[in-house]
Amino acid sequence: MLKDLNKVRNIGIMAHIDAGKTTTTERILFYTGINRKVGETHDGGATTDWMEQEKERGITITSAAVTCFWNENQINIIDTPGHVDFTVEVERSLRVLDGAVAVFDGKEGVEPQSEQVWRQATKYNVPRICFVNKMDKLGADFYFTVGTIEDRLGAKPLVMQLPIGAEDAFDGVVDLIEMKALTWRGTTEIGTEATVEEIPADLVDRAQEYREKLLETVAESSEELMDRYFGGEELTIPEIKAAIRKMVVNSEVYPVFCGTAYKNKGVQPLLDAVVDYLPSPLDTGEVEGIDVKDPEVTLTRKPSDDEPLSALAFKIAAHPFFGKLTFVRVYSGKVEPGEQVLNSTKGKKERVGKLFQMHANKENPVEIAHAGNIYAFIGLKDTTTGDTLCDPNNPIILESMDFPDPVIQVAIEPKTKSDQEKLGVAIQKLAEEDPTFTVHLDEESGQTVIGGMGELHLDVLVDRMKREFKVEANIGDPQVAYRETIRKPVESLSYTHKKQTGGSGQFAKVIISIEPYAPAQEELEEGESAIYKFENAVTGGRIPKEYIPSVDAGIQDAMQYGYLAGYPLVNVKATLEDGAYHDVDSSEMAFKLAGSQAFKEAVAKAKPVLLEPIMSVEITTPEEYMGEVIGDVNSRRGQISSMEDRAGAKLVKAKVPLSQMFGYVGDLRSKTQGRANYSMVFDSYAEVPTNVAADVIAERNGTA
């Protein structure tokens, strides 16, 4: 356990599904001495893929936190999933990382999920280096991939290595800083060290050209280096590395390395790059939070054991022996087993049981959790994802994480009475672990409805209910998570709630206005939502201050069940303009009911419409099936955004309603003899065409 934070790296490995993330992580663990036998994703032996479903499906679902060492540096790695349905795992891990390795498929370049994960990393200001993997694959093209990093991500790639050979003949890399060739000739066993050679003659000119580009970029990073470089002076290797590191930490450039993790070529230089260029907790610097007593006040904590404790819980996982594991990034201060900490998000004190550093699903006990590191805590009862843990005498709330709403739902019915009880426990445990997994009772049908980020997400959750909690249940067909909103403002709607039933009565009068509300993300204040805004415009104490939050709460209750078909309302601003109260008969409950009813009446007059989730779909297909594929997209109410050439095939980009995409994988296979593939990510909500909306509403209201 290192105390020198300069030698600690908290990094994530992020990529599109199947770009080779988990294999890259496995190789890193082997080379850093943790794994004696290397695990392969395709035979279900990977260390970080430790849930049953991950082993079966060969994809990574849960970010496992793994600690390893390289050249006296400690590297904490979070292996993040690349499948779109698990974006919440990616968001959670990025929030607590200092840097990341973005892995790209050397043939495909930047893929849709790579773009989404890249955007998420940019949102959290995570510095990155890039690894172009699968250089041994048929059709692998390093220069094409670097081009896609620039064109599709709008990033500035800094080429650090050139490949020697490609596809089967990929033998190694040219190191552009040292100007040497590192080769792993032929079939290399795992653990094989690179042979250092002179650069092959046919690559010397190209290497010289790319080194000049690299040095020009380095020179531009400071006036002093620029004067020296363009004055003809040689820059030293330590100077070049220090300048690149500074640019990476500031997210100005993204160094690009290459190799094939599966064939054990290029992994050691990648590890060197993690240490050389990605930031330590000291580079990342102070973490900001807000004062519990006064949310207007910003507090900071330095990454030091001597500061008061501040830490963020970023993941909950169930452990077969210890029960609930809470994965925590400690930003400042230190914690020991048995110590009491404050969960400032919930306002509750928690006692820390045991502390571990995790190696996938194996645990190593530690005596002290130090600043700047990642640990698993045992014994925290009330802490959930996104909560802050801190020193009870110096409370702080760190910026929380925001998670997307589910876009797909299914009804779930337990088969027997005992399954009913087990289902309750299973749902509670899974919802604790995963904030994008939701559950509610459909009041009309009496069914339990669970929601998630896609069909695979819900499949995995239902699978876990069966395996881990032994719940047998019938699962309904997927349903789309529609929303409702309003299209026109309604002004000064008055509603009076009055009840006289012996003794004290109930009285509350409110006058509200509502209007469509869709602010741009950058216009929102900290903690504000784009879904709903409440404004209090009451003057002169016509409604006492203590009743105002009740009106707000009543409106928020009413927003859960929309006017058209009972779907949640979004993008509405409500203003409380005026009202009246009674000294004896008014109460918080009366104002809550008045707010709720006034809002419902206003929505009915505000031209309510139905919204549906639209997915951004990318289909890669051989050219001969283009007509079929495009015709099929059009028949699904899809809109083609663009068509382009992609590595001997055609790439079709489209926006398609989610309701039209169920079962698409089978349809696409049969239309293209299994030669096309697709990926989709959630794009936005859009208004449902009138004729389609009428059917959805009729079906929902039981009048179809």
Swiss-Prot record:
InterPro entries: EFG_II, EFG_III, EFG_III/V, EFG_IV, EFG_V, EFG_V-like, EFTu-like_2, G_TR_CS. It is found in: Cytoplasm. GTP binds at residues 15-22, 79-83, 133-136. It comes from the Bacteria. One of its GO terms (cellular component) is cytoplasm. Keywords: Cytoplasm, Elongation factor, GTP-binding, Nucleotide-binding, Protein biosynthesis. GO terms for biological process: ribosome disassembly. SUPFAM superfamilies: EF-G C-terminal domain-like (SSF54980), P-loop containing nucleoside triphosphate hydrolases (SSF52540), Ribosomal protein S5 domain 2-like (SSF54211), Translation proteins (SSF50447). CDD domains: EF-G (cd01886), EFG_III (cd16262), EFG_mtEFG1_IV (cd01434), EFG_mtEFG_C (cd03713), EFG_mtEFG_II (cd04088). GO terms for molecular function: GTP binding; GTPase activity; translation elongation factor activity. Residues 6-282 form the tr-type G domain. Catalyzes the GTP-dependent ribosomal translocation step during translation elongation. During this step, the ribosome changes from the pre-translocational (PRE) to the post-translocational (POST) state as the newly formed A-site-bound peptidyl-tRNA and P-site-bound deacylated tRNA move to the P and E sites, respectively. Catalyzes the coordinated movement of the two tRNA molecules, the mRNA and conformational changes in the ribosome. Belongs to the TRAFAC class translation factor GTPase superfamily. Classic translation factor GTPase family. EF-G/EF-2 subfamily. This is Elongation factor G. The gene is fusA.
